[in-house]
Swiss-Prot record:
The lineage of its organism: Bacteria, Pseudomonadati, Pseudomonadota, Gammaproteobacteria, Oceanospirillales. It holds the Pfam family AAA_2. GO terms for biological process: cell division; proteolysis involved in protein catabolic process. It comes from the Bacteria. This is ATP-dependent Clp protease ATP-binding subunit ClpX. The keyword ATP-binding applies. Keywords: ATP-binding, Chaperone, Metal-binding, Nucleotide-binding, Zinc. Zn(2+) binds at C18, C21, C40, C43. Transmembrane segments: none annotated. The keyword Transmembrane does not apply.
Length: 427
């Protein structure tokens, strides 16, 4: 039998076996011969997987050894998010200090450094989520988005706060070590504000109750998370995840917060240096939000303990027409570049005229949806064209002007070797 396994019986027609897994030549697709040894295709695949994993781990550790500086973090954010300089600076410094703190603690330093979680305040579509996503991609750490409106206190219908950590674990294939250095973005945090200043007999399970549940998670605790989530398999051994090194970024529009800030400023303005009321009301929402203080957030409905866990507050400005046009054209993932690429795959060039871009920006401002509304406008405008183009072989260019955005005309299609189409394009 030993002779058969080593392949000595090759000439005599005896069965050949893989020297590694012991499978016969009939059990595998291919058996590769070497000097007195054989290896099957399955073992070759396994070896490739092992080598690939080791290379990937080595590359990841090399890339994560160097922490990007605040300047480099801001430059990367500039590639994807237009404007919002103040928020970018605050995020760059906070994130840099957070991961610097992790490295310092790994070396068992004498001074204990606190965690700087972040609160982003800004209108819908101003770039809060995109900033958090870009940070996670740059730092190559696990990232998850949680919706605060779906969270409830433990024991009530809805998601428990531990589900947030569950989602983070899923992003890194349940690697606890990686998850403990991840970033969690909790969206719509303003929607879990306390419903009223007065304590109520009925429990506020989706408002103040959620804030209380999030307190320890954000500050740092050891959360018990089942490997496959939920409570369906109580016999499973729970994973212990320490959240003290997870960076939490909370974001919300905080509609009405600017009024609370103005009211506070008016009450405090007495004497010769007082700010005139008309000056306060003439300030934009973005400018007013710059002056936000802890007491304003507490009056809005966040409990003091929760606000205390979010020491870094960054406010984002409303996007004006010029900023929306820049968003359409400048970032790496600009919508005009994305649609141009889609048309390019059909060997068609797409030309967005300047007046069309202005018209798209105006429409988005009217809808009050910020940058998020730009894609839906473009999808609506280009739907019929994207439906027709794959079936039309001779189209070489599509021109989008102001009339197309307003719904007054169809996109101009320029055909190969068509004089009429060329004249139409010139007009």
């Amino acid at each position: 039998m030993a002779d058969e396994r080593s392949g000595k019986g090759e000439d005599s027609g005896k069965l050949l076996y893989c020297s590694f897994c012991g499978k016969s030549q009939h059990e595998v697709r291919k058996l590769i011969a070497g000097p007195s040894v054989f290896i099957c295709d399955e073992c070759v695949d396994l070896c490739n997987d092992i080598i690939r994993e080791e290379i990937q781990e080595a590359t990841t550790s090399d890339s994560s050894d160097r922490l990007p500086t605040p300047h480099e973090i801001k430059e990367t954010l500039d590639d994807y998010v237009i404007g919002q300089t103040r928020a970018k600076l605050a995020l760059a410094v906070a994130v840099y200090n957070h991961y610097k703190r992790l490295r310092y603690e790994d070396k068992k330093g004498e001074v204990e450094l606190g965690k700087s979680n972040i609160l982003l305040i800004g209108p819908t579509g101003s770039g809060k989520t995109l900033l958090a996503e870009t940070l996670a991609r740059l730092l190559n750490v696990p990232f998850t988005i949680a919706d605060a409106t779906t969270l409830t206190e433990a024991g009530y219908v809805g998601e428990d706060v531990e589900n947030i950590i569950q989602k983070l674990l899923q992003k890194c294939d349940y690697d606890v070590e990686k998850a403990q250095k991840g970033i969690v973005y909790i969206d719509e945090i303003d929607k879990i504000s306390r419903k009223s200043d007065n304590p109520s007999i009925t429990r506020d399970v989706s408002g103040e109750g959620v804030q209380q549940a999030l307190l320890k998670l954000i500050e740092g605790t050891v959360a018990s998370v089942p490997p496959q989530g939920g409570r369906k398999h109580p016999q499973q051994e729970f994973l212990q995840v320490d959240t003290s090194n997870i960076l939490f970024i909370c974001g919300g529009a905080f509609a009405g917060l600017e009024k609370i800030i103005r009211d506070r400023a008016e009450k405090g303005s007495i004497g010769f240096s007082a700010v005139v009321k008309s000056q306060l009301s003439s300030k934009s929402v973005g400018e007013t939000l710059k002056d936000v203080e802890t007491e304003d957030l507490i009056k809005f409905g966040l409990i003091p303990e929760f606000v205390g866990r979010l020491p870094v507050i960054a406010t984002l400005d409303e996007l004006d027409e010029a900023a929306l046009i820049q968003i359409l054209t400048q970032p790496r993932n600009a919508l005009t570049k994305q649609y141009s690429k889609l048309f390019e795959m059909e060997s068609v060039e797409v030309d967005f005229r300047e007046d069309a871009l202005r018209s798209i920006a105006k429409k988005a401002m009217e809808r009050k949806t910020g940058a998020r509304g730009l894609r839906s406008i473009l999808e609506q405008v280009l739907l019929k064209t994207m439906y027709d183009i794959p079936s039309e072989q001779d189209v070489c260019k599509v021109v989008i002007d102001e009339g197309v955005i307003a719904g007054e005309s169809e996109p101009i299609k320029i055909y190969k070797n068509s004089e009429q189409a060329k004249l139409a394009a010139d007009e």
